[in-house]
UniProtKB/Swiss-Prot annotation:
InterPro entries cross-referenced by the UniProt entry: HGPRTase-like, PRibTrfase_dom, PRTase-like, Pur/Pyrimidine_PRTase
Name the record gives this protein: HGPRTase-like protein 2
Keyword flag Flavoprotein: no
A molecular function (GO) term: transferase activity
Lineage summary: Archaea, Methanobacteriati, Methanobacteriota, Stenosarchaea group, Halobacteria
Keywords associated with the record: Purine salvage, Transferase
Family matches, as Pfam families: Pribosyltran
């Protein structure tokens, strides 16, 4: 986790209407994502996650690169939860709200009985993951594991659900600085 920890010290923090937003290669693709950092993170996810699943599920946009690399390494199929509808049969919509945005997302190709691993870049306010978990649960999928690369320490909307996420690193962002816990 050396590269991940090192990358946090170089990551800019911007203010989004009073919310300290970490701009990081894993969570934003900016600054440029070094392949060694992505590889380190994916190897760590593989060692952390329960991979006895039918599908890897990741939200658009910044979960995609992690889940793609993980899918390539594990040969587990990947489902992307999209930000726009396609109107396909069985498509399920969900409403997600974070500390800085609100939108609809759409799930395709997850069915009752599917065993899924959810992978995402960041757990901050928890709005996205809480909405995804609730929707997958409503579909009847079994959420076997949830792994995020970074988790901001503090309350999150995921706390109000029956689901727990494992993080590779827990952080705080305060006064423009990132602290690893």
């Amino acid at each position: 986790m050396e590269k991940l920890i090192e990358s946090l010290s170089d990551a800019p923090i911007i203010d989004k209407d009073g919310y300290e937003y970490l701009v990081h290669p894993i969570s934003n693709g900016v600054p440029m994502l070094d392949p060694d950092l992505l590889r380190e993170v994916v190897v760590e996810v593989m060692q952390t996650a329960d991979l006895d699943v039918d599908k890897i599920v990741a939200p658009e946009a910044m979960g995609i690169h992690l889940a793609t690399a993980l899918s390539l390494q594990t040969d587990i199929p990947l489902v992307v939860i999209r930000k726009r509808p396609y109107g396909l049969e069985g498509e399920v919509s969900l409403h997600q709200q974070t500390g800085y945005s609100e939108s609809e997302m759409y799930i395709n190709d997850v069915e009752e009985g599917d065993r899924v691993l959810i992978v995402d870049d960041m757990l901050s306010t928890g709005g996205t993951l809480a909405a995804i978990c609730t929707a997958l649960d409503d579909i009847g999928a079994e959420i076997v594991d949830i792994v995020v690369v970074l988790r901001k320490v503090g309350d999150s909307a995921l706390d109000d659900t029956k689901f727990d996420a494992t993080s590779l690193l827990d952080i705080t962002v305060e006064d423009g600085d990132v602290t690893v816990h």
